[in-house]
Amino acid sequence: MTRSEKTRHFGNQNYEKLRKICIKKKQPFVDTLFPPTNQSLFLEQRQSSDIVWKRPGELHPDPHLFVEGASPNDVTQGILGNCWFVSACSALTHNFKLLAQVIPDADDQEWSTKHAYAGIFRFRFWRFGKWVEVVIDDLLPTRDGKLLFARSKTPNEFWSALLEKAFAKLYGCYENLVGGHLSDALQDVSGGVAETLHVRKFLKDDPNDTELKLFNDLKTAFDKGALVVAAIAARTKEEIEESLDCGLVKGHAYAVSAVCTIDVTNPNERSFTSFIMGSKRKQNLIRLQNPWGEKEWNGAWSDDSPEWQNVSASQLSTMGVQPANSDSDDGDFWMPWESFVHYFTDISLCQLFNTSVFSFSRSYDEQIVFSEWTTNGKKSGAPDDRAGGCHNFKATFCNNPQYIFDIPSPNCSVMFALIQNDPSEGLKKREPFVTIGMHVMKVENNRQYRVHTAMHPIAISDYASGRSVYLHLQSLPRGRYLLIPTTFAPKEQTLFMLRVYSDEHIHFSPLTKHAPKLGLLKCKSAQSVTRLTIHGVDFNSASTGTHNVYAILKDSRKSFRTKTLSGVKSIQWDEQFLFHKSKNRQQYKIEVWEDRKMARDHLLAQSVIIALIDNENRDTTLQLTDPRGTVIGTVSVTVSAFDDPMYL
């Protein structure tokens, strides 16, 4: 597992070196990799003589990168259909630490008498595990003396226009910014874990996932610095940018700038009794920013809505909640949560996990893997093939890369973020992403070798033909699990990055070997594989009180233990163990123990299993005898034994 935080220079352009050259020559920088011509605007060669490239100093006598800091109003969409990026930039203004990462050394880049002007700027975007520094000149496309694309409402502030230009360079040209993915833009400007929630699906899949839970989850993520953008999906091309009666726009993205709960006084209950007893109710609100800088929600809790009269000025001031300016249609508005989930269909958020061990707030364990789906030049399904496709392709599915991890406790939460490499960085021609996803299954407690026959999945991510997919696992039983990242179809080859975040450390490692070598010198090949499933025990009569019981499974060399469970007469484990052998007849011993905590553990009973390699799955019930030889119950077991060591 490797991780590199070193910044990569896009096009091998070094900002410091180029800036020194420009200052020495007393000439402002002109970027030859992204020239101020139609070549940088369009996918194909076009004539557009009315577009003039101008530097900020030609557009305003007192240009600045920032004017009084950054705010959502600094980012207003131009004629380019790139609300996905503009909304992400608007969301970025709520996380100053990230903004400083994307726009490094802003003070040194600012127009100032303290240092020479060189017409060169740098920005950073997160790509495939590294921050990529993109250098640009400050020549911006204009028409009739006005910026064509992103701009600030403050006429002499230019950070948003310059940031958009750097992003266009990363994507090959400005036209490539039309109609992108919200989650990609959020990830590019944050390096966080991107996830898109489909509101209807989220509320429908699990009846326990209510609107309130979604609100609380979103508020928690936002308060921790997550970047959040919401959108209303358009079903057809004709519906894109269609305005609804409520003021919202279909096929359009809005940056989320606040998520909060306020107290609202009931205007009909303002008597002395209600004052003493309390007549307030809670109202969940969300604040959004339209990148157009206009067109707002006009329903309850909109700018000039009467609902604001029922909220005290002191509460608004204390909570930092202020109704948007009712005197202008600036694209900034509040709306009630219940209306938000009614109209908005998708929520894209990019979470930033705290991985510092010195933090007082909750921190996460982070593990990162770089690998690839590749056939290794082999036929599909060959042992070294690592591009097997999804579970639909059963013959090759298990050929994919495999990663094993242990859940140490039932309260452990694990998040997986799978990202594929973008081969089109900086190119006009965009190669389509392959469809990717993740598949998780529970495996034997002692498995150390690759799975060859898929077991029942306990979780499957959405499959998406985008840059990344996300999977969150909660409340899994303690045990060993296998993660298989896949493309949808076999033989699809590309690099991928896998990030794992957990609130407890989990041992996460790749499985590369098919079977062990046996014998003293480790030179014998395994001839068979056996899976033993210990389901549970039933005692003939209930003893007094509840006992904590576990089982130990032994072969001639090793022993393995189940978890400890409490019970009176019956104990159910349903735990599996795997054995590779060089003999066709195998013997195993099962011991049932009482976990006495404060004293030495007590052997309750034992039994012996004779496993024949018969290529069958056999359920069997064995008698349990205590140390004196008395039968005191039974243990139920499934024996799956095969003469192909690479069968299971």
Curated annotation (Swiss-Prot):
Q: In which tissues is it expressed?
A: Expressed in neuronal, but not in GABA-ergic neurons, intestinal, hypodermal and excretory tissues.
Q: A single GO BP annotation from the record?
A: proteolysis
Q: What happens when the gene is disrupted?
A: RNAi-mediated knockdown prevents neuronal degeneration in a mec-4(u231), deg-1(u38) or gsa-1 gain-of-function mutant background.
Record-annotated active site: 83, 252, 290
Q: What is its EC number?
A: 3.4.22.-
Gene3D superfamilies according to UniProt: 2.60.120.380, C2 domain (2.60.40.150), Cysteine proteinases (3.90.70.10)
**SUPFAM superfamilies the UniProt entry points to:** C2 domain (Calcium/lipid-binding domain, CaLB), Calpain large subunit, middle domain (domain III), Cysteine proteinases
Q: Where is the Calpain catalytic domain?
A: 28-353
A GO-annotated cellular component: membrane
Keywords, sorted A to Z: Autocatalytic cleavage, Calcium, Differentiation, Hydrolase, Necrosis, Protease, Sexual differentiation, Thiol protease
Q: Which GO terms describe its molecular function?
A: calcium-dependent cysteine-type endopeptidase activity; cysteine-type endopeptidase activity
- Name one matching Pfam family: Peptidase_C2
Q: Name the cofactor(s).
A: Ca(2+)
The record describes how the cofactor is bound as:
Binds 3 Ca(2+) ions.
Q: Name all C2 domain ranges.
A: 502-625
Q: Which domain of life is it from?
A: Eukaryota
Specify where the region named Domain III lies, as residue ranges: 354-509
Instruction: Give the family this protein belongs to, as stated in its UniProt record.
Output: Belongs to the peptidase C2 family.
Function according to Swiss-Prot or TrEMBL? Required for the correct female sexual development of the soma and germline in hermaphrodite animals, while being fully dispensable in males. Has calcium-dependent proteolytic activity and is involved in the cleavage of tra-2, for which it acts as a potentiator. Capable of calcium-dependent autolysis. Part of the necrosis cell death pathway. Required for necrosis of intestinal cells induced by B.thuringiensis endotoxin Cry6Aa.
Domain notes from UniProt: The calpain catalytic domain is essential for in vivo function to promote female sexual development. The C2 domain associated with the domain III is primarily responsible for calcium binding.
Provide the protein name. Answer: Calpain-5
Can you name the source organism? Caenorhabditis elegans
Gene name tied to this protein: tra-3
